[in-house]
């Protein structure tokens, strides 16, 4: 399996995804600020992978601490705030830092710093390993839902699926969320072909998902983001499935910009649209999608394509990194605890609290 991140002997190692698919560059660092920069610049990206990386980033930060125990609380408070500020939309990041905070709160008073740091390191490994396990469970629940929803169709043919951005090993530690469902469905003979949209402006679908599919030998075709509607119109897509960066209590889902447009097209053409994400992506403290902070990124991401200027430097740009798909457009939200279909307020609360 592709090694997107790892942590060994105090060193965080990551595959710099900005250079894929043309170059595979692995970077090693023991500096927490360098790890934060990797998250900010999308060298490391994808909500679950960001969460695991955030845990390791906190470990890097505490390993850099050289003061006494009395000075650590203020240092740790600032460290957590610094990590939290790196990607404000990805709730998995906050899930990870919350877990690290819980270890601190439970052990700081009675433990030495050495013992405390060891427990925090163990928690970072657990966050990472849990994400790997969750992907396997999400894939199984997703395939079960597809078999249920497409029982009649699957009697005569396989399915064609649309996915957006990248939700595979490069984003999720394990086999992936949405792409994990696709991988397992393909292995079980349900999938004919995967349609992956380019995912402008950083082309995660074209660069990363296509690379993973080619690596696995799964039939696919890449399309421009605006092409999904005509493929649906012509019967070339049976369903769509994406990941998520944050899901609110009512099922509203923030994901890579362009997801909402695909969901609207799917609804118009009568096709089911699914979300696959771990429970850590669900934020039931937010009632609806309008509460989700939407990151707006550097306008040069549109003005330039991998360093090549394609618009004037003064061209006004609106560059939202995410959009919010209303839960009313989503057929089901697939988690490691099962698929939630129907009443999201009840179902999502159940999987979060159960």
From Swiss-Prot:
E.C. number(s) listed in UniProt? 5.3.1.23
Membrane-traversing stretches:
none
The UniProt site entry described as Transition state stabilizer is assigned to 165
**Protein residues bound to substrate:** 45-47, 87, 204, 255-256
Concerning InterPro entries, the annotation shows: IF-2B-related, IF-M1Pi, IF_2B-like_C, Initiation_fac_2B_a/b/d, M1Pi_N, NagB/RpiA_transferase-like
A single GO BP annotation from the record? L-methionine salvage from methylthioadenosine
Q: What is the reaction catalyzed?
A: 5-(methylsulfanyl)-alpha-D-ribose 1-phosphate = 5-(methylsulfanyl)-D-ribulose 1-phosphate
User: Which positions are catalytic residues?
Assistant: 245 (proton donor)
- The main enzyme category here is isomerase
UniProt entry keywords in alphabetical sequence:
Amino-acid biosynthesis, Isomerase, Methionine biosynthesis
GO MF term (any one) = S-methyl-5-thioribose-1-phosphate isomerase activity
Q: In which pathway does it act?
A: Amino-acid biosynthesis; L-methionine biosynthesis via salvage pathway; L-methionine from S-methyl-5-thio-alpha-D-ribose 1-phosphate: step 1/6
Please give the family membership noted in the entry: Belongs to the eIF-2B alpha/beta/delta subunits family. MtnA subfamily.
Q: What does this protein do?
A: Catalyzes the interconversion of methylthioribose-1-phosphate (MTR-1-P) into methylthioribulose-1-phosphate (MTRu-1-P).
What is the protein name stated in its UniProt record? Methylthioribose-1-phosphate isomerase
């Amino acid at each position: 399996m592709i090694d997107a991140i790892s942590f060994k002997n105090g060193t965080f190692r990551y595959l710099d995804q900005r250079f894929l698919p043309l170059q595979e560059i692995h970077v090693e660092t023991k500096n927490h600020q360098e790890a934060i920069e990797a998250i900010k610049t999308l060298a490391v990206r994808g909500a679950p992978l960001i969460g695991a990386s955030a845990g390791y980033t906190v470990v890097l930060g505490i390993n850099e601490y050289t003061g006494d125990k009395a000075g650590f609380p203020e240092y740790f408070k600032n460290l957590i705030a610094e990590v939290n500020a790196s990607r404000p939309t990805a709730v998995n990041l906050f899930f990870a830092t919350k877990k690290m905070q819980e270890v601190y709160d439970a052990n700081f008073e009675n433990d030495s710093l050495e013992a405390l740091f060891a427990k925090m390191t163990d928690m970072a490994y657990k966050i990472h390993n849990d994400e790997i396990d969750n992907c396997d469970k999400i894939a199984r629940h997703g395939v079960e839902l597809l078999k249920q929803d497409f029982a009649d169709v699957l009697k005569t043919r396989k399915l064609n699926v649309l996915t957006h951005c990248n939700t595979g090993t490069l984003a999720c530690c394990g086999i992936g969320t949405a792409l994990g469902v696709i991988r397992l469905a393909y292995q079980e003979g349900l999938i004919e072909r995967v349609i992956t949209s380019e995912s402008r402006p950083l082309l995660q679908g074209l660069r990363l998902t296509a690379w993973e599919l080619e690596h696995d030998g799964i039939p696919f075709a890449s399309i421009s983001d605006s092409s999904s509607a005509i493929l649906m119109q012509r019967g070339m897509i049976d369903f769509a499935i994406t990941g998520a960066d944050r899901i609110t209590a009512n099922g509203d889902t923030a994901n890579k910009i362009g997801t909402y447009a695909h969901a609207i097209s799917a609804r118009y053409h009568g096709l089911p649209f699914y979300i696959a994400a771990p429970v850590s992506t669900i934020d039931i403290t937010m009632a609806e999608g309008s509460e989700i902070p939407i990151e707006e990124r550097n306008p040069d991401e549109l003005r330039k394509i991998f360093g090549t200027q394609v618009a004037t430097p003064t061209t006004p740009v609106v560059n939202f990194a995410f959009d919010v798909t209303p839960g009313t457009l989503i057929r089901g939200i697939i988690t490691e605890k099962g698929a939630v279909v129907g009443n999201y307020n009840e179902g999502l609360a159940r999987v979060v609290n159960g």
